[in-house]
Amino acid sequence: MRRRFLAFVCCFGMLASLLPCSVKANGRTTNVNLLETPEEVAEVFYRQNASLRKSKGVTAQDQQNEIRKRVIVESAQTLENTYGAVKTYYYTVGGYQILLYDSADQAELAVTNLKKDYPGVHIFQDIPVTLEEAARDGDADVQVEIQDAAEKEDESETETEIQAFDGIHMMGMDKLKEDAKDWSGDATVAVIDSGIDEDHPWFTTRLDRKNSVNLAADGLGKDAYNDPNQGHGTHVAGIVTQATPVQVKIMAVRVFDLTGSASYTTITLGVDYAVQHNADVINMSLGFEILPGFESDDTDLMDEAFARALEAGTTVCVASGNE
């Protein structure tokens, strides 16, 4: 028993030496807080946006400026100098630190200095991403199609599905659904996107309301995953429900806010959340574009989230485009 106790103490001591405890930055002392779930990280981003929520007429540019105030350091090593970070966090699932700054310019300067201090460590400003204008414009017509199809469902369900989404028929998904009519299993598909229209009749019995969530910075909670503006997530989830048997449920993971903005970090949180809540499949038909000014290796964070998902046995489906 004594040996086990000593071994535990030694292991704990080694872990504590790796995790950051505090940093001193330009006269500031910043305690490092541990964040153990994607929801906890989302809450930090939500609090960061507090002043923005009080403003009227918040734009996508405003949201993107807030995102650029964050710096990601992919290391558990204690930082001797954060160059002015007002808050420092360590996300245990992803194994990286999140530094918050008063301005995007301060964050950019900090990245330059931190890269000099820690060569070989992946350090970058959080990356704003936006839903493509083409996707947003096209979804207005898609929503009309969905609504028309739902109203005609009583006439002929199979015919309606094909009329609403020709792609389902082209890919043979309508036949697959018919072949699976006697399937006795179940599955949950996490749709990481702009949310979902929770009141749409197609989702009445197909939505996993317990685990659907909003991780976007404009709201929190299980009841905030509704998609009132964009429609893209509703479109994607509609295709899933109409191409699969009733045993397949949708877990709506909202990562885009009302302006159509998200961050690379928030999207990776969506992947972690889906894995932690036992999604069988993750769907990311996001149709977003990375704004200019970022290096290609900044996307490693997403690759690492995918690796965690695959290790957990979760299937990840990512769209490459609509062509």
Which ranges hold each PLM region?
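Positively charged n-region of N-terminal signal peptides that target proteins for export
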Residues: 1-7
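Hydrophobic core
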Residues: 10-18
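Autoinhibitory propeptides
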Residues: 14, 61-63, 77-167, 178-179
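Sec-dependent signal peptide cleavage junction
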Residues: 18-29
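Solvent-exposed loop/turn segments at secondary-structure junctions
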Residues: 105, 127-131, 194-198, 246, ...
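Structural detector of well-ordered beta-strand residues that form the stable sheet scaffold
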Residues: 124, 251, 315-317
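Active-site core segment of subtilase-fold serine proteases
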Residues: 154-250, 269, 276-277, 281, ...
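Substrate-binding/access-modulating region of protease and related hydrolase catalytic domains
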Residues: 256-323
